[in-house]
From Swiss-Prot:
Any Pfam family the entry gives: LacAB_rpiB
Name listed for the protein in its UniProt record: Galactose-6-phosphate isomerase subunit LacA 2
Gene3D superfamilies: Sugar-phosphate isomerase, RpiB/LacA/LacB
Gene: lacA2
Family per record: Belongs to the LacAB/RpiB family.
Subunit structure, as described in the record: Heteromultimeric protein consisting of LacA and LacB.
Keyword Isomerase applies: yes
E.C. number: 5.3.1.26
Keyword Isomerase: yes
One of the GO BP terms on file: lactose catabolic process via tagatose-6-phosphate
């Protein structure tokens, strides 16, 4: 599993904190905005492309408020994404919704909270079962 991460200009500082945190946890991290800072639309599309390259990959996109990146991610066929600003939602969106991308706002989530959000997301596992009906509905929408 690789964690694909990207950020626009507003999210670069928080992205580096999260990237370091993930690397300390021995996760494979792919930064799609390491060499070129792009708009959140292009960054989100780049993250989603890499997430879709492997069923095990997860994605994290950071912009100022998390909303713009979320809107882009939800337009991608087969992608379930969640905008999160707390630890429990990050964990539950993996378990119940099989979200493969989360978006965060650097103006919303402080570094300590962001690390806990990331922990919940990457450690969460999809529960399947009764939740699959909802995931199937989401996947039919795009």
């Amino acid at each position: 599993m690789a964690i694909i991460i990207g950020a626009d200009k507003a999210g670069q500082e928080l992205k580096e904190v999260i990237k370091d945190y993930l690397k300390e946890g021995k996760y494979e991290v792919v930064d799609v905005s390491e060499n070129e800072v792009r708009d959140f639309v292009d960054t989100t599309l780049a993250v989603a492309k890499e997430v879709n390259a492997s069923e095990d990959n997860l994605g994290i996109v950071i912009d100022a408020y998390g909303v713009g990146s979320f809107m882009v991610a939800t337009k991608i066929k087969g992608m379930v994404a969640a905008e999160v600003s707390d630890e429990r939602s990050a964990y539950m969106t993996r378990g119940h919704n099989n979200a493969r991308i989360i978006t965060l706002g650097s103006e919303i989530s402080a570094p300590g909270i962001a690390k806990n959000i990331i922990k919940g997301f990457v450690e969460g596992k999809y529960d399947g079962g009764r939740h699959q009906v909802r995931v199937d509905m989401l996947n039919k929408m795009c």
